[in-house]
Each structure stands twice: as structure tokens, then as C-alpha cells.
Amino acid sequence: MKVLSLIFVIFSVLVLFASAKDPVCDQPKAVGRCFAAFPKFYFNSSSGQCEAFIYGGCGGNENNFSTLEECNAKCA
């Protein structure tokens, strides 16, 4: 019985950590202060999806990915 309880606890912890989202994903979209026009992706926590935006080239935050795949791997 103790072994079964231990297995349940370990499984629960693994599920909890596997489903934990990176805090970067909760940051808002930030286009930056400059005036370049780089196509990027960010995770929209309201829609629960990665979305395209135009990045100005400087400033901003870490919720800024070069590809949709990179954004999905980190946040979705």
C-alpha cells in the first residue's frame, strides 16, 4: 500500500511539473520602442494561442519568438 501511495505522489508531481507553463508566456505582447518591422510570434494568454505580431527591433520582453513552432513549444 505504501508503494502504491508513493507511485501516486510521484506521478502527481510529474504531471504538475509537465503542465506548468513558463512565466514568459504570461507576459503581454510588447512591440518594442524602435521602428523596424520584424515578423515575430507571442503567446496570447487570453486566447491560449501563439499569434503573429510586428516587433520594432528593440525593447519588448521575452514573450517574443522567431517562429510559431518555437512559441508553441515553449507556451502552448
From Swiss-Prot:
Cleavable signal peptide: 1-20
Domain BPTI/Kunitz inhibitor: 25-75
Keywords: Blood coagulation cascade inhibiting toxin, Disulfide bond, Hemostasis impairing toxin, Protease inhibitor, Secreted, Serine protease inhibitor, Signal, Toxin
A GO molecular function held by the record: serine-type endopeptidase inhibitor activity
GO CC annotations, alphabetized: extracellular space
Residue pairs linked by disulfide bridges in the UniProt entry: C25-C75, C34-C58, C50-C71
Tissues of expression: Expressed in salivary glands.
Subcellular location(s) of the protein: Secreted
Major localization class: secreted
PROSITE patterns for this protein: BPTI_KUNITZ_1, BPTI_KUNITZ_2
Known function: Potent anticoagulant protein that inhibits the hydrolytic activities of all serine proteases tested (trypsin, thrombin, elastase, and chymotrypsin), with the highest efficacy on thrombin.
Protein name as it appears in the record: Tabkunin 2
Origin species: Tabanus yao (Horsefly)
Lineage, broadest ranks: Eukaryota, Metazoa, Ecdysozoa, Arthropoda, Hexapoda
